[in-house]
């Protein structure tokens, strides 16, 4: 990791803590605000710990872009959680063969940038 990317990553990590400190839930209720602040902190810690040993500059850049997108989307929509996405359904393809491979490729490419670190299957 270069010194410039290290500083950028540390700045993003600090911005998550600043964001959590200033966060207000859209509902205005204190319980919701506390839960959402805790979610922001836990999510940041988990993802930064998961990616701390990356050495490939391209992967580091992707993670930085994902982090920036998550911050911007959270601020714009006033929700700390990733926005739900609609992936192509797999109900019409056979269990094996080209159709399944095509559907899996579509699902892989249709996953937005801000969800690349999530291992969840929709």
Swiss-Prot record:
May promote cell proliferation and inhibition of apoptosis of preadipocytes. It comes from the Eukaryota. CDD domains: Complex1_LYR_LYRM1 (cd20261). Belongs to the complex I LYR family. This is LYR motif-containing protein 1.
